[in-house]
Amino acid sequence: MKVLVTSAWPYVNSVPHLGNLIGSILSADVFARYARLKYGKENVLFVSGSDEHGTPIEIEAIKRKVNPKELTDQAHEYDKHLFLNVWKISFDNYTRTESETHKKFVREFLLKLTKYVKVSEDEIPFCEYDKLYLPDRFVKGTCPYCGFEDARGDQCDNCGKLLTPSLLVNPKCSICGKAPIFKKSKHWFFDLSEFNEKIRSWISSSNEMPDNVKSVALGWVSEGLKPRSITRDNKWGIPAPFIGAEDKSIYVWFEALLGYISAVIEYFEKKGEVEKWKEYWFSNDIKSYYFIGKDNIPFHVVILPAMLMASGEEYHLPDVIAATEYLLYEGQKFSKSRKIGVWIDEAPELMDVEYWRFVLIRLRPEEKDTNFTWRETVRIVNTELNDDIGNYVNRILSMLNRYYNGIVPEFRSDALDDNDKKTISLINEIPKIVGDLFEKGKLKAGTEEMLRFVRECNAYLNLKAPWDLYKAGKEVELNNTLYIGVNSVKTIAILLYPLMPSHAQEIYDMLNMGNIENEKWDIASKLSINYGHKIGKVKVLFKKLEPEFESKIKDKLEKIRKDIEKMRPTLLK
């Protein structure tokens, strides 16, 4: 089976914050690392890229009197460096919407939709002060559905409804704040109404789509799908391919969604295997995973599958769409202008990146909005990582050194007591329990099961008390306890790997087990470290955050923020 893992493409006009990271890219990376161990790295592909077209970039370029691509070149490379080199995101291909492969594919694909594309004149908001047609997101006003006063012209962040600028009450240009006029302009529309029942049936029949995703998407479908404009009056974008649309560009949402396909095409083009991309899009033996934020649900669960259906080709429709709710920062929404939150180029200066990876998965808002706090961060690092995982690993391996010079003792299956049998059963079962949750997009829930296993292992060790067995000369029982213990440490390393790859490798180094990336997920369920194996050097796995960490962190953040701001590319300052 081929496994395609994707994450929503970050828009390059700002550095992603922690909420953006956990909502898509980090979640996708954790799953991709799991999938490679489970299904083999040769069968898993993880792609994403920079979303770089549209009005925000165009306006910024006009202000600075530069070509938009100059700005996005810098921003793309900056984000790419952060993802790949700092946050250890294991993309197989992190590309961009300015890729020639992407632009070519998008234009060719949209021409396949002509049966469902209609041309009509539409009233488009135009700012007389800025002398600019305003795309949906550059018009703000009051949501007609929930009354939220800061709704965008494409979507209300409060109730999640998709909008058009003409629906807003008291619309304003988000650049200058003045009321726009509405001018007629010819545009090309994708008639979603043709797919209302097909999309409804597809969503309803899915056994793998999470309930929160189904609920949002079916709510939108039940209101009746309407034609959505494919084209915009922007200059900075992919030129529309339709006859008569030479002065138009393609709406960024339509082209960015197609990036999931073009990124796979580009990956295999670079490998000289130009037809192999089809194995990830046209075979029956595929499973695809999309990691997104909840505000992106309608685009991924309605517009993308409708486009794939409309193409007339047998594209594989999305399987698991794992959409997070919002991550709050100390009870507030992240805000760049008000400096509320932490951004992904700031966070590594405050704490080890892999601590961040673990903390963010532990706080992943899978079913409801979740509040990030520094207090909870300290608890997770000091209690779960250090006291639970790190302490257990150290105790088992240190005792193996102390009592057996680091050599795994002989195992006697005929001399097991009930506690031994229970712990072996846990080792046998836990990889499947965690894996099944991961495959439903429930990474936080899977991690909670891993921690439950660690706590059970700690309880087993305390109950068996190897130090007392050693003193009492109970060699067979001591042998079995540490044999089971060292194998449970291997299990913990494999379960931890998707979240903390370097620390998991450190455990494998202590076990003298080689490269964990070449391991198989299912080996975590087996007692595979055998009698006579010599472990490596034991060292401290984690370090606790200092008692004053929480009280000092905000001052530290303020100090580093100014220096980091200077290092950012022009577009991201």
Curated annotation (Swiss-Prot):
Note describing how the cofactor binds: Binds 1 zinc ion per subunit.
Residue window of motif 'HIGH' region: 10-20
Catalytic activity: tRNA(Met) + L-methionine + ATP = L-methionyl-tRNA(Met) + AMP + diphosphate
Reported cofactor(s): Zn(2+)
Entry's transmembrane regions: none
CC terms in the record's Gene Ontology section: aminoacyl-tRNA synthetase multienzyme complex; cytosol
EC numbers, comma separated: 6.1.1.10
Residue span of motif 'KMSKS' region: 333-337
MF annotations from Gene Ontology: ATP binding; metal ion binding; methionine-tRNA ligase activity
Residue positions binding ATP: 336
Binding site for Zn(2+): 143, 146, 156, 159
Pfam family, one: tRNA-synt_1g
Highest taxon, organism lineage: Archaea
Purpose: Is required not only for elongation of protein synthesis but also for the initiation of all mRNA translation through initiator tRNA(fMet) aminoacylation.
Record family assignment: Belongs to the class-I aminoacyl-tRNA synthetase family. MetG type 1 subfamily.
UniProt-recorded name of the protein: Methionine--tRNA ligase
Organism: Saccharolobus islandicus (strain M.14.25 / Kamchatka #1) (Sulfolobus islandicus)
Organism taxonomic ancestry: Archaea, Thermoproteota, Thermoprotei, Sulfolobales, Sulfolobaceae
The encoding gene: metG
